[in-house]
């Protein structure tokens, strides 16, 4: 092992997490932590790792952006024909991970995934910068392309095509909502004795919470 890598470590000491102070609704508590991260000016606070897997269990992960927190789900948008989209089609489960190093906090969210309505996707799509809208139309995400010029020429072609007109929401693009059945809140502590509080859904859809060892 590279000795320089093995010696990299940080002692966590900023805060603590007590099960009695966390409430009974994990999504509300997530919103509280998210707002604290915003106030702390965490860089790209809504960036999250999205882990998916094929139907035979081959995993993949990438960074995407959270775009909405609902009462029962977390929403992001992407190309439905991308690698992640194809995996979610055949295996509609995912894990989201947020790591806010400035606050020494991590949140892990596991659950089933469903597409949001086309109406919701359309509203968000047209809130994006125009260049991003056209980019979503022209990019065959995750598929091999000959070179960058291929993308640039398609972008120029469709920019002219849509000049003075609204960009249509492409059929291959839209949102997903992750409906959690397990959420874990992690707070870094000294000596690696971190605080980990887990919420899991019972069969009656209520949440139970408990502490797990770090």
Swiss-Prot record:
Record-listed E.C. numbers: 1.4.3.5
Binding site for FMN: 62-67, 77-78, 83-84, 106, 141-142, 186, 196
Residues the record lists as binding substrate: 9-12, 67, 124, 128, 132, 192-194
Broad class of enzyme this protein falls into: oxidoreductase
Keywords for this protein: Flavoprotein, FMN, Oxidoreductase, Pyridoxine biosynthesis
Keyword Nucleotidyltransferase: no
UniProt cofactor note: Binds 1 FMN per subunit.
Oligomer status and interactors: Homodimer.
The name this protein goes by in its record: Pyridoxine/pyridoxamine 5'-phosphate oxidase
Biological classification of the source: Bacteria, Pseudomonadati, Spirochaetota, Spirochaetia, Leptospirales
């Amino acid at each position: 092992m590279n000795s320089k890598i093995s010696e990299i470590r940080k002692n966590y000491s900023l805060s603590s997490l007590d099960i009695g102070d966390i409430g009974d609704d994990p999504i509300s508590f997530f919103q509280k932590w998210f707002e604290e991260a915003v106030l702390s000016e965490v860089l790209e606070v809504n960036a999250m790792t999205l882990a998916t897997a094929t139907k035979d269990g081959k995993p993949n992960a990438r960074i995407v952006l959270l775009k909405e927190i609902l009462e029962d789900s977390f929403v992001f948008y992407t190309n439905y024909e991308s690698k992640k989209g194809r995996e979610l089609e055949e295996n509609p489960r995912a894990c989201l991970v947020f790591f806010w190093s400035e606050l020494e906090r991590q949140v892990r969210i596991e659950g089933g995934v469903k597409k949001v309505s086309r109406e919701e996707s359309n509203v968000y799509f047209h809130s994006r910068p125009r260049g991003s809208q056209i980019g979503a139309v022209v990019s065959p995400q995750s598929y091999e392309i000959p070179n960058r010029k291929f993308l640039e020429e398609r972008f120029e072609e469709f920019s002219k095509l849509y000049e003075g007109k609204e960009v249509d929401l492409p059929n291959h693009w839209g949102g997903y909502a992750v409906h959690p059945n397990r959420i874990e809140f992690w707070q870094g502590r000294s000596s690696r004795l971190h605080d980990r509080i887990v919420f899991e859904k019972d069969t009656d859809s209520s949440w139970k919470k408990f502490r797990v060892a770090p």
